Amino acid sequence: MTYNKETLKEAIVQKLRLNYGCTEQQATDGEMMKACAMVLRDIMAEHGVQTREETAHEEKRKVHYLSLEFLMGRSLMKNAFNLALLEPLTAAIGELGFKAADIFDMEPDAGLGNGGLGRLAACYLDSMTTLEIPATGYSICYELGIFKQKIVEGQQVELPDDWMQLGDAWLLPKLQEAEEVRFGGKVRTRWDNNHLMVVHEDYTRVLAIPCDMEIAGYDTDHVNTLRLWQARSPKPIDMKLFSEGQYLHAAEERAMADAISQVLYPEDNHYEGKSLRLKQQYFFVSATIQSITRKHIQQYGTLRNFHEKNVIQINDTHPTLVIPELMRILIDDAGMGWDEAWHITTHCVAYTNHTVLSEALEVWPQQLFETLLPRVWQILQEISRRWQQQVEDFFHDPAKTAKLAIIWDGGVRMANLCIAGSMAVNGVSALHSEILRKDLFKDACQMMPDKFKNVTNGIDHRRWVPQINPGLDGLLRDLIGEGYLTHPQELKKLEAYAGDKAVLRRLEDIKHQNKLAFAAFARKHQGVVLNTDAIFDVQVKRLHEYKRQLLNALQIIYLYQRLQDDPSLDLPPQTFLFGAKAAPGYAVAKRIIHLINSLADQINSDPLCKDRLQVVFLENYRVSLAEVLMPASEVSQQISTAGKEASGTGNMKFMMNGALTVGTLDGANVEMHDLLGDDNMFLFGLHADEVEHLRHTYDPNLLYQRDPVLRRVLDQLKVGFRDGVTYEDLFQRLVTGMDGQADQYMVLADFAAYCEAESRMRHTYRDRETWNRMSLTNIARSGVFAADRAISQYADTIWHVPYKQ
């Protein structure tokens, strides 16, 4: 069926009548949004059936992308855009008496992720679909998502994010495909005719119910699926206890099961939290691999060719338990011997590492495995024993054996399990992969050098330019055509216009219109009035000390003090925009949010700063906010400690929208610099090797004593701000290190260089032609950071699957 404005109107009206019992005149905006979603869902479901039939008929190798996060954002406009139905859908909504912008705005962000990890997974799913790779994403259907951030008296407060009230319109529950996941109990084993017989008894059952979200590709009928698992108890409420008045006890087992899919990253600084997190991870991978193997057997009748027809890509260490769980199925259910099962597992699982931070390389208490996952624990012990023997035979070095051990000193190391059980291990930027090879996983790389690869991250450029920045998209189509939508390297053609003053003026006007649009958004949603004549200087990302929002705050204090000293100081007006969520248990990150808000309160209420300096913390940073902010941004702050950021993807989105980067040589900034040179970004700070070299002798207290400018800035933390809040704890953390190493992330070491880079940026901003030319150059050279390039690299070097060229 061909869809146009009229057929879409008919379909929407029918959905309203059949699902909500109302006419278009009676429908609410929410009902209208869900009706539109259902219409698009039906179109995608039809395409999905055709895609799966074709994949099965041609016996194509499938990619299974496992990630504890998928930060999908909103899907209505995205799916309409990919299906080439955005214009007719917008017109249909209008003719039914609604404002299309209001309907698109009704959709909540799907609460299935936190930061870059989840957004990357979402971008990759779009790209795999557009490139017509048969792929399924797998995650948990978190009912309350990460959390909704509220700023109260300058501090972060976490509220539940009930996104499914409206967001469930995309989900298709598949009750008939539910899987059973087992926790606890006892395991008995015996040998019968040279076969190991395993009996698991007295376990607790949890049902995993799949809810499927169809994913449309751009300019293709190919549709892939994101499968989200909901946890439910198979047991009904205990009616005997309920009738006796023991209501909570009667529903206890049900509540314990439901908790598994309730919240992303439950706090784990206590035993119960750790237990719930491990349950989440095992629930997710067990349901997933059972589903994959079941479908494989239905098609091929055997698991002996499983590795030839399936690739399991694990996004960070959270899905690592898929390795022992696949082994369990192959040995216990399929009756294979160890060697055959291990061969299959290690020829289909691939691992993407996303961090060099030691605290993020998961280590689980052995005791949790013994009690929660007794059979998996047995398999882990055997994997560990054999791996340890392999390491010993290679190195004959007890220290290296200990470092690479999977089970050691009462802990189970997920990253080492990934290395042992995967066919490929990749980093996500050239610098990050080099650190993995030469430092973090140096010994493993020495054993298996061919296993380690690099695939620099990429972004869904179709979402992050044409969908969110129609002004820029219009300019690009006028100048270079629409080929860049499917071949992002064609953005390079834009560089031919770097000397065209009319084009540069048009680019500047597009940016100004986007600033006005974001200012209207900020006023509506946060009640803040932005100075649109100021530089929009933006740092939005997860709040972590290594990302150094604190360095940015100190630089703002320095700028404010300069204005206080000399009110006639000639500086271009500057608006600093922050957006970040801190993990609920990360006290220091929460204090940095509080500091930024104290600073904002001080500066924004000082008449001296009016129309000159402004600081705004954007509440509840999320994908839909980023979609309005990034086209309006002029300066992109990418200032992590060199060697700590694996890649980053926000830097790529800003670059593609023409913002100029102030940044360190860290993560993908290194590759951006390779493309742009010193002339088109503002670099500063220590390099990764310099950070490690300095660490042995670094004394931030000495910097504090010797540098009067820095000392005055830091003393302001102790004095505090007009809200009466002081930050002695942050001062101590930077200068003296009360509970460990002072200034672990080299904030003070890079402070002077950062202030100088900001000064260079402000100076360049005054030269509008130069600035706009730099902006155009950034856009023109950003095509390499498209997810299509990254996915084609995965397909060629790791997955070995064909794709649409």
Which residues are covered by each model-predicted region?
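A conserved ligand/cofactor-binding region detector
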Residues: M1-Q805
